[in-house]
């Protein structure tokens, strides 16, 4: 068993960023600045990358697939597919950065689940081997007032382990 690095296509994100770059409204300017922030999970020698590398190289996680997906995702991917209620406060413009009515800056790395579970190789592995496992780490965005303990961008790791009961019972 070997870890796979699965990179989800970012073409849609690139198109949305091109459209965003044409805008000059305050909301667009704020989002453009946030998108310029480095994802410290990918920056060599950053304390965040060092810590996350230690996590993903723990014996328990050494074979987990690593999922990299766009920073801009659809409302469906960020909320609907994770069963976030339509009236949940996290959907409000006061809590989430909306690019347009259908796209947001990702608010959590859990969003990777829908991308991962749609991958044909992943589904084949689940069928043949009885389990799948993945981690996703990266920068996420939430509207927070900046103070000593809050910033609108931070780094997060999320994991997923799914198995057939015949393979393992998780307690």
List each model region and its residues.
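TRNA-recognition modules of translation machinery and tRNA-sensing kinases, especially anticodon-binding
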Residues: 2-171
